[in-house]
């Protein structure tokens, strides 16, 4: 099964080609803010380098959130379009679960977190592929409390630059063997999305929506305008 994976939920842009759970080729552009401009050329280049076309792909996989609102929509819209037009499978993978795969070989609790400002994080904790703290929007103090309550001795934080919170994290998890990922260890890899996509449930392209984990201002405005309470699995993107 050939899987084309797309990661546009962070400032880095990544696309990958997997043969089942085997990585064939991956491209990553760090600190790339023009995802809407660069995504299609990167996909075309990746396919051309491997003598393939979009028609050869069996499954399209995309980081479905959380992350950058604009980036989420760019990646998901592209994957949905390919899957719909070519009548191929579409799957969505948690950004945080994919980040946790950077340390898949470690015997540790992996806390994947993206800075959401003001000491808030989009975060989840994983043992291998198993989520032990559900992906959510947490204040740092709440996240540390939940991690501290778990029995795992080794804990690795990945996904963001945690240096400015290092002292607070260390104090909150004083009884843990703590490591904070640095530099390229925090990159989101489309190849990891491809591996996770092998066992991910297939989505209906017409119903697939981003997993923001919190409302955007546009969603607040939409709820006010329509009088309908926004739900995380609602078809808000389709409604507006």
PLM regions with names:
Residues 1-64:
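N-terminal beta-alpha supersecondary unit
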Residues 13-18, 121-125, 211:
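Short beta-strand scaffold segments in enzyme catalytic cores
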Residues 22, 34, 89-187, 229, ...:
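Surface "functional belts" at beta-alpha junctions
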Residues 30-38, 69, 73, 77, ...:
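Residues at secondary-structure transition points
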Residues 46-50, 85, 103, 190-201:
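Stable alpha-helical structural segments in soluble proteins, enriched in small hydrophobic residues
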Residues 61-90, 95:
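DPxDG-like acidic metal-binding loop motif
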Residues 179-240:
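Acyltransferase
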């Amino acid at each position: 099964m050939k899987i084309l994976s797309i990661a546009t939920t962070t400032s880095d842009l990544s696309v990958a080609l997997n043969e089942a759970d085997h990585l064939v080729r991956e491209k990553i552009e760090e600190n790339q803010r023009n995802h809407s401009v660069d995504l299609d050329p990167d996909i075309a280049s990746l396919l051309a380098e491997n003598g393939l076309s979009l028609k050869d792909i069996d499954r399209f996989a995309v980081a479905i959130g959380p992350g950058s609102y604009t980036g989420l929509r760019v990646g998901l819209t592209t994957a949905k379009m390919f899957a719909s037009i070519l009548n191929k499978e579409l799957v969505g993978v948690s950004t945080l679960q994919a980040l946790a795969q950077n340390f898949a070989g470690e015997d540790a609790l992996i806390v994947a977190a993206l800075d959401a400002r003001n000491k808030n994080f989009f975060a989840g904790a994983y043992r291998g592929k198993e989520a032990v703290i559900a992906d959510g929007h947490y204040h740092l103090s709440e996240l540390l409390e939940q991690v501290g309550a778990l029995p795992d001795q080794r804990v690795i934080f990945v996904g963001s630059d945690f240096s400015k919170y290092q002292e607070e994290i260390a104090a909150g998890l004083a009884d843990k063997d703590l490591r904070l990922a640095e530099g390229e260890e925090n990159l989101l890899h489309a190849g990891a999305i491809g591996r996770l996509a092998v066992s991910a449930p297939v989505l209906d392209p017409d119903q697939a929506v981003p997993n923001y984990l919190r409302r955007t201002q546009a969603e607040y405005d939409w709820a006010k305008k329509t009088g309908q309470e926004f739900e995380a699995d609602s078809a808000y993107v389709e409604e507006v």
